[in-house]
Curated annotation (Swiss-Prot):
Catalyzes the formation of the alpha-1,6-glucosidic linkages in glycogen by scission of a 1,4-alpha-linked oligosaccharide from growing alpha-1,4-glucan chains and the subsequent attachment of the oligosaccharide to the alpha-1,6 position. This is 1,4-alpha-glucan branching enzyme GlgB. The gene is glgB. SMART domains: Aamy. HAMAP family: GlgB. It catalyses: Transfers a segment of a (1->4)-alpha-D-glucan chain to a primary hydroxy group in a similar glucan chain. Gene3D superfamilies: Glycosidases, Golgi alpha-mannosidase II, Immunoglobulins. Belongs to the glycosyl hydrolase 13 family. GlgB subfamily. Keywords: Carbohydrate metabolism, Glycogen biosynthesis, Glycogen metabolism, Glycosyltransferase, Transferase. It holds the Pfam family Alpha-amylase. Pathway: Glycan biosynthesis; glycogen biosynthesis. GO terms for molecular function: 1,4-alpha-glucan branching enzyme activity; cation binding; hydrolase activity, hydrolyzing O-glycosyl compounds. InterPro entries: A-amylase/branching_C, Branching_enzy, GlgB, GlgB_N, GlgB_N_E_set_prok, Glyco_hydro_13_cat_dom, Glyco_hydro_13_N, Glyco_hydro_b.
Length: 715
């Protein structure tokens, strides 16, 4: 070993150099080209130029640091290293030009780079005629970052990265390739070695409990065909089937179905039932099955539980081929504190708030994104755009928006920090959500977004330019709570809660609402939807059929969690399949038939969807018959005679000669009756049609028990 080495040499061998390119690789010194290479375990190293000339490099440090003059002064060369009896020709990663351009660094610095996924992460590329992988990661407060993986024996000494701009570390590793596993080893500014970190921008990841990122070849991921145009528009029917991919169906040994096996079964099933969209619970990579995907660590990687990114693309394509829109649950509100993830990423609170009063979610034990950081907002917005572009999904449902909007969300007095005006509104989160929606609709005008927002925050689905948050839709949590509470009561008590059905129409058009019967309503001791229904066996199923019909006749788009469509009796369990054997029973088949027929009516009857989000599309007819638990209303479409009369009877009694005024004289046809024998009902009804007579046209109807009927005017 040469005794008079510069400090930079020791920084290299000790793994603490922030810019190894300043010392390693080729350098012009005294009009000669000197090359230095750090190859631990190498017995000897030669430099071989493009003409075949060779020059032995001298070992200048016993740890494996070599240096020497390049033959012929060439800047293009390889390293020929001997490891025991093996001789290997290597490309020197420290001779290649930068990955990020100055313009990239400028955009990254100001937070306006809208395609982070094109620059950060691991990308196959060719530099100076050599194939390899370029790695880029944000770690502005790190002292040193190294790439470790299959290509370097997971030895952090071999591939330290260089830092550029405002904390972006990069390195091109020749001959690394698709399928290689990798992580980042980070040393904090204080010199502490952190747990190995997965790539925040990884496009593929290992199956839990392993946590390595995987280099992906994007050419192998086919771009799914688009969904039908306008499928998510306010004036289009929108009926969403919400699915947890790991428990929709399972194999006989309780193993998951793969993405491709799901592609063969799920889209056809959903389309047969008449739904227009399928919504997947979060498919981002996540370490804990019991989080259902809502605690992701790999926001850019489809979970490897069910296959590869190529397989997930095939599932999206199959849904589109069946005419279904694809929505993803998206979680920009919080993330888990697993040591391989985003938490304390570079030794500091890079993605989260440092103060736990702002940065930790007490209910879920997760960390909250710091929306005041440009890099964090850019990361999240880019992630949203990534799924819409790369996998052609048709929209994103944003989870737990209320927890983002309020600084005091689920916090005791004194357990939160007010904003700069002394209020509880999270101003940075508001700005983030507005930017997210603005960017999504600017680049993907046919896509949509939906907010799970459980408070009365105003203008959630109003445009940003009018002061709103800019979402396409908002989940109507108030409707869900009120109506489930009402329908769960014994009919004898419902007259005292008549207002729970009426109240929703006071605000039904203040937002573009989705009516959600989601996964959250069939877990944690709440029972299944069927499990909430009162009465004996027949009454429970009649109540359920009536409730679903009421939902489809109510203004707002529809969402139903898997299993609800056939009356799953037990709560949802993410560790097992739905109870498909229940379809052997007539009562459960009847519920499934009701859902199929309601979907088909909803999709084909403009009165039920065209003005879902417009008060002109709804008119109460009967609101004051609480003693008999009866309601009636008209749904309207744009055409003059696009009308649907809805009668809901939430009592177990039959009412004969029930008078209901209607807008048109003549015949009205009964197009749906949830009490039909076809569904398992008592088959009470109006024998197909009724004549409206009188100066003010009225129908004299037979109203079946615990049932909802639809009637439309004949042309």
């Amino acid at each position: 070993m040469i005794a008079t080495l510069p400090d930079e040499a020791y920084a290299i061998v000790e793994g603490r150099h922030a810019d190894p390119f300043r010392y390693l690789g080729p350098h012009r010194e005294n009009e000669r080209t000197v090359v230095r290479a750090f190859l631990p375990e190498a017995a000897s190293v030669e430099a071989v130029d493009e003409k075949g000339g060779t020059a032995a490099l001298e070992r200048i440090h016993d740890a494996g640091l070599f240096a020497g003059l390049l033959p012929n002064g060439s800047a293009r060369y390889q390293l020929r290293a001997r490891f025991g009896d093996t001789i290997v020709d290597l490309e020197d990663p420290y001779r290649f030009p930068p990955i990020l351009t100055d313009f990239d660094l400028y955009l990254l610095g100001e937070g306006s780079h809208q395609r982070l996924y094109d620059k950060l992460g691991a990308h196959l590329m060719t530099l100076d005629g050599v194939e390899g992988v370029g790695f880029v990661v944000l770690a502005p407060n790190a002292r040193r970052v190294s790439v470790v993986g299959d290509f370097n024996f997971w030895d952090s000494r071999r591939h330290p990265m260089r830092v550029r701009g405002s904390g972006y570390w990069e390195l091109f590793i020749p001959r690394a390739t698709a399928g290689d596993h990798y992580k980042f080893e980070i040393v904090s500014a204080q010199g502490h070695l952190l747990p190995l970190k997965s790539d925040p921008m990884a496009f593929a990841a290992e199956m839990r409990p392993s946590t390595a990122s995987i280099v992906l070849d994007p050419e192998r991921v086919p771009h799914p065909r688009p969904a039908p145009a306008g499928i998510s528009a306010l004036t289009s029917p929108m009926s969403i089937y919400e699915v947890h991919l790991g428990s929709w169906r399972r194999k006989d040994n309780n193993d998951w179905l793969s993405y491709r096996e799901l592609a063969e079964q799920l889209p056809a099933y959903v389309r047969d039932l008449g739904f227009t969209h399928v919504e997947f619970l979060p498919i981002n990579e996540h370490p804990f099955d019991g989080s259902w995907g809502y605690q992701p660590t790999g926001l850019f990687a489809p979970t490897s539980r069910f296959g590869t990114p190529e397989d997930f693309a095939a599932l999206v394509d199959a849904c589109h081929a069946h005419g279904l829109g694809v929505l993803l649950d998206w979680v920009p509100g919080h993330f888990p504190d697993d040591p391989h993830g985003l938490a304390h990423f570079d030794g500091t609170s890079l993605y989260e708030h440092a103060n736990p009063l702002q940065g930790r979610h007490n209910d879920w034990g997760t960390l909250i994104y710091n929306y005041g950081r440009t890099e964090v907002v850019n990361f999240l917005v880019s992630n949203a755009l990534f799924w819409l572009e790369r996998y052609a999904v048709d929209g994103l449902r944003v989870d737990a928006v209320a927890s983002m909007l309020y600084l005091d969300y689920s916090r005791p007095a004194g357990g939160w920090i007010p904003n700069k005006y002394g209020g509880r509104e999270n101003l940075e989160a508001i700005d983030f959500l507005r930017r997210f929606n603005t960017e999504v609709f600017a680049k993907f005008p046919n896509a949509t977004t939906a907010a799970e927002e459980s408070t009365a925050w105003p203008q959630v689905s109003q445009p940003v330019e009018f002061g709103g948050l800019g979402f396409g839709y908002k989940w109507n949590m108030g409707w869900m709570h009120d109506t489930l509470n009402y329908i769960s009561m014994d009919p004898i008590y419902r007259k005292y809660h008549h207002g729970q059905i009426l109240f929703g129409l006071h605000y039904a058009f203040s937002e573009n609402f989705i009516l959600p019967l989601s996964h959250d309503e069939v877990v944690h001791g709440k029972r299944s939807i069927l499990g909430r229904m009162p009465g004996d066996h027949w009454q429970r199923f009649a109540n359920l059929r009536a409730y679903y019909a009421f939902m489809f006749a109510h203004p707002g788009k529809k969402l139903m969690f898997m299993g609800c469509e056939f009356g799953q009796d037990r709560e949802w369990n993410h560790d097992s399949s739905l109870d498909w054997h229940l379809l052997e029973q007539e009562s459960h088949r009847g519920v499934q038939s009701v859902v199929r027929d309601l979907n088909n009516l909803y999709r084909t009857m403009p009165a039920l969807y065209e003005l879902d989000c417009d008060s002109f599309g709804f008119e109460w007819i009967v609101t004051d018959d609480g003693d008999r638990n009866v309601f009636a209303w008209i749904r309207k479409g744009n055409a003059a005679r696009a009308r649907c009369l809805v009668i809901a009877n939430f009592s177990p009694n039959v009412y004969y000669d029930y008078q209901v005024r209607v807008p048109f004289p003549g015949k009205w046809r009964e197009v749906f009756n949830s009490d039909s024998a076809h569904y398992g009902g008592s088959n009470v009804g109006n024998i197909g049609e009724v004549e409206a007579v009188g100066l003010v046209p009225e129908l004299s109807l037979t109203i079946p028990p615990l049932a909802v009927i639809f009637l439309t005017p004949e042309d």
